[in-house]
Amino acid sequence: MEHVKESINFKLRGKSYNLSVDDVVSSMKGIRPDGILKYYVRIGDMDYPPKQVLSESLGIQRISFTTKDAYDILTRLGFVVEE
């Protein structure tokens, strides 16, 4: 993974957030990946669905954002979302 930025500020459905690479990585420690439907993000040696990663990292429900939202935010941080 090539990190573009250490942290980013963004709005998601009208709410402001700040998220760092370290926030994402630490939030996924000890979390088992859900099944991969189409896209995945590799964190450590595990592949996770992008929505699971963003949900765990922000502490919000997956229904409150799209896979494209997760893709855009994670790629801005430098994570690679693969198919």
Predicted regions located by residue number:
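Terminal leader/tail segments of proteins
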Residues: M1-E83
